[in-house]
Amino acid sequence: MNSPAADQLFRGLALALPEVGEKSHFGKADFRVRNKIFAGFTADGLAYVKLTSDQQEMMCAAEPIVKPIKGGWGRQGWTQIDHAGADGSLLQSLLLTAWRNVAPKSLQKGAG
């Protein structure tokens, strides 16, 4: 669950994306592009990303460490990751997908 090394990897990958900044939401770090949240950390030490429903369904079926956040947030595509058990390529793919889901189209040209 909570791993400082995994947190650092997730944070570094998120902040490497174009125009991403780190802020706080309910006392936990989140990552935003042009003030739109696309990823962050949950209160219980997991990471989360914003996926579409189809992306979420596909990722949850393919990766046992990826699950919808419980309740209404999960039905909106918010997806938790036990990032301590994830490799960097999976995290990078999830973060890039989530970033693309919220970043303006003009910013996406040439990214990833």
Language model segments and positions:
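Charge-dense, helix-prone N-terminal extensions
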Residues: M1-G112
